[in-house]
């Protein structure tokens, strides 16, 4: 990727969300690391559920997302290759619940704000429910972005919110 004298920078648009783990991309842009290496990078905030559409349309050339999302996209005909793993998350995701939910089984029949199928929050919620003898059919899903799920939960909407940092600590 090293830039050559007089060469024009290669334009690259990267789609990200507000998830903390994607911050190194913005930091690299702001620090001039991409530019120094011959890349003219633009960072676009695009919800995870829409990033595959932005890739397919050519609006972006790269997408920062989770590993399971790459698998889903490939399975659905979006030919992509994972280039790098930015980080490993051990605790940035979480399920916020109201005071009347003492155990996961108490979520049966409740409404949970969670991102679309194929996203990390959706996968996380499905995993939590499965580990507790439940499925997604046992709850009512209100599909919304992780930020919107946290905001709706704070506003008193929904019984729970599956989200991640930086939104999780606000609920």
In which residue ranges do the predicted regions lie?
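N-terminal signal peptide c-region/cleavage motif recognized by signal peptidases
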Residues: 2-4
């Amino acid at each position: 990727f090293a830039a050559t004298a007089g060469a024009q920078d290669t334009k690259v648009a990267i789609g990200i969300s507000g998830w903390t783990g994607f911050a190194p991309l913005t930091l690299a842009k702001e620090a001039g690391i991409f530019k120094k290496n011959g890349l003219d990078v633009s960072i676009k905030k695009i919800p995870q559920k829409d990033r595959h559409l932005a890739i397919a349309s050519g609006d972006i050339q790269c997408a920062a997302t989770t590993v399971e999302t790459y698998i889903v996209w490939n399975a659905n005909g979006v030919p992509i290759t994972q280039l790098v793993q930015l980080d490993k998350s051990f605790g940035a995701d979480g399920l916020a619940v109201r005071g009347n939910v003492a155990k996961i089984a108490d979520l049966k029949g409740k409404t949970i704000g969670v991102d679309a199928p194929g996203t990390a929050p959706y996968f996380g919620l499905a995993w939590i429910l499965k580990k507790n003898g439940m499925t997604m059919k046992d709850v009512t899903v209100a599909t919304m972005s992780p930020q919107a799920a946290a905001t709706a939960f704070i506003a008193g909407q929904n019984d729970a919110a599956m989200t991640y940092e930086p939104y999780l600590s606000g609920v």
